[in-house]
Amino acid sequence: MTILNHTLGFPRVGLKRELKKAQESYWAGNSTQEELLNVGRELRARHWQQQQQAGVDLVPVGDFAWYDHVLTTSLLLGNVPERHQNADGSIDIDTLFRIGRGRAPTGKPAAAAEMTKWFNTNYHYMVPEFQQGQQFKLGWTQLLDEVDEALALGHKIKPVLLGPITYLWLGKVKGEQFDRLSLLNDILPVYQQVLAELAKRGIEWVQIDEPALVLELPQEWLDAYQPAYQALQGQVKLLLTTYFDSIGHNIDTIRALPVQGLHVDVVTGHDDLAVLNKNLPKEWLLSLGVINGRNVWRADLSSWFERLQPLVNSRPLWLGSSCSLLHSPIDLNEETRLDAEVKSWFAFALQKCAELALLTQALNAPNDAKLAELAAYSAPIRARRSSSRVHNAQVEQRLAAITSQDIERQLPYEARAETQRKRFNLPAWPTTTIGSFPQTTEIRGLRLDFKQGRLDGKNYRTGISEHIKHAIAEQERLGLDVLVHGEAERNDMVEYFGEHLDGFVFTQNGWVQSYGSRCVKPPVIIGDISRPEAITVEWAKYAQSLTEKPVKGMLTGPVTILCWSFPREDVSRETIAKQIALALRDEVEDLEKAGIGIIQIDEPALREGLPLRRADWQAYLQWAVDAFKLNAAVAQNDTQIHTHMCYCEFNDIMDSIAALDADVITIETSRSDMELLESFEDFAYPNEIGPGVYDIHSPNVPSVEWIEALLRKAAQRIPAERLWVNPDCGLKTRGWPETRQALANMVLAAQRLREEQV
């Protein structure tokens, strides 16, 4: 039996972030909708061709999205919140953008949909909204249109569709509460209609993604799979697709389903392939996700060959990426500045396609020449194990010497809070921001000129100093209580720190999509991590010299740096996090010596790092909390430690949030209408909290009354004396006009509430 290969999805944004640029041009009114649609067509055609040329047998169609693939599925099903609907009930691309951003070139602005993390990745999806009795219909034919495009170009394709149960699982009920699973029978007819349309086009296989099957689902959700897939069978062959973890705990449900194939992630998952092979129906195709879609490391193809060869001819087999290549940069060949040895350790999306092709060829026709090719390809990643670039004896010794005293503050929170109140004398409802201010074209140009050698260090520092001075002056004028320096010197909250730590390397074009048009360029952790010199002290000290008000020192926490980087795979995540924590612990100490009394250690990714299965949570939370405390505990009692978290469901990890022992935690809550505070109320969270009062991901400016109402809602759950007032997140992606207006309204809302207390 010939083995075929396929990818589960491909990066959408383009090698030069063409999609991002086209989206933002269209949103700004600088280009037409047709010009935007043309960019999408060109990117899809290029990406299909690139995969085919790299040796991929079946290219995915339906993985492209204008904003997010879950949002695309919502539109496919006609699930558009009433506030975003067109007057005539039609659905167009601006409908999609209004749901994602809150506004579009046409239609009335309205609050954007909630956004949260896609499983345990750094990609974000738009949360589907459900209401009792809502109707579903095929409302958006993007998938079918793109299938027609790909077929017209002569590609062998495999359409990709987010499965119905995972779709419902990912959504939220709005308004009157009910069981969203009860909507299953309402959405299945749309899925049937889509599959029928695909069958008409001669499609043989459809990849139907059900990553919820790696979770510990409630029994009623597991029970729903059988009738759902009974309703979907018969029109095309269904490849039930899972990723991000193992499926062994749900195998009884899976193997009883009326599907024709199963894809499993054997990179992240730990399913025994021999047992899995034995337990599945003999006629099923088994697709093995052997090439890591979430990291940048070259695969050891010789090892994979040895592991997979016993399965050849046991059943129909495909080889695939572990998950969509969405999470990987596109092309390593674009990286012209990487050291040759380090570059030889990496593979980006196109190289991963070539890896699939090479491994498939070797398994289909194993001969000495092919095995030698596998060995030659795998040699660099094997040689890395003994590279001096990877190991630092001093770091390893310091890590081994950590004691329990190193991770505890000197005094408990209540005693620290008293010393901090005396030091800072802040008003009730203290106002602050999360850290960054708008990254203007001028700021980005300044950094780029410095990076490319067109600007010397002295003039660069002068330019950055001017932007910091401007940010401090703006905050003083607005009347904020605790200021920030604005982070003009930082391109990205993780990349900036990685650039100043040993053990990291950086790419030129290693962009991956975070959400919508937002792309990030994660650093790669290649070895042991240390801090050669202070990173943030110069700018924090300068900013503090400009004002009598406290200025926060701003650090990205160890768990977030780990989660938002491509990590090394030869040591545990715990080891990496604690190495980063030790490096940043020294930074906390240096900031204190420079007179900085409030230090924020951002951990927006803390929850995102959770394993997908609860059985594995406790071990992760223990070392994640310890890493944060190792970073922070060197601070003196009158130094106020803040932390910030994003997109979190906190109720199931409140013990660990409290265990961080941060003096103040700021969280994103505005999109969820403060419902996240219920977790803190139920837990009786003891420290101070800054619930975000407006959504910085939307350009809409909140009114004073809106902010005041949210703060009143917050005060019903948290004592007012422990509440701070702040936006949801950093302001780097916003413009100055809306930033000024929103912050002015926020400060005024806080002042009104203070006046009531007098």
Swiss-Prot record:
L-methionine binds at I434, G435, S436, E487, D602. SUPFAM superfamilies: UROD/MetE-like (SSF51726). Catalyzes the transfer of a methyl group from 5-methyltetrahydrofolate to homocysteine resulting in methionine formation. InterPro entries: Cbl-indep_Met_Synth_N (IPR013215), Cobalamin-indep_Met_synthase (IPR006276), Met_Synth_C/arc (IPR002629), UROD/MetE-like_sf (IPR038071). Keywords: Amino-acid biosynthesis, Metal-binding, Methionine biosynthesis, Methyltransferase, Repeat, Transferase, Zinc. Binds 1 zinc ion per subunit. One of its GO terms (molecular function) is 5-methyltetrahydropteroyltriglutamate-homocysteine S-methyltransferase activity. The active site is at H697. It is an enzyme of class 2 (transferase). This is 5-methyltetrahydropteroyltriglutamate--homocysteine methyltransferase. Belongs to the vitamin-B12 independent methionine synthase family. GO terms for biological process: methionine biosynthetic process; methylation. Its EC number is 2.1.1.14. 5-methyltetrahydropteroyltri-L-glutamate binds at R17, E18, L19, K20, K117, R518, C519, W564, E608. Its cofactor is Zn(2+). It comes from Yersinia pestis. Zn(2+) binds at H644, C646, E668, C729. Pfam families: Meth_synt_1 (PF08267), Meth_synt_2 (PF01717). It catalyses: 5-methyltetrahydropteroyltri-L-glutamate + L-homocysteine = tetrahydropteroyltri-L-glutamate + L-methionine. Pathway: Amino-acid biosynthesis; L-methionine biosynthesis via de novo pathway; L-methionine from L-homocysteine (MetE route): step 1/1. L-homocysteine binds at I434, G435, S436, E487, D602.
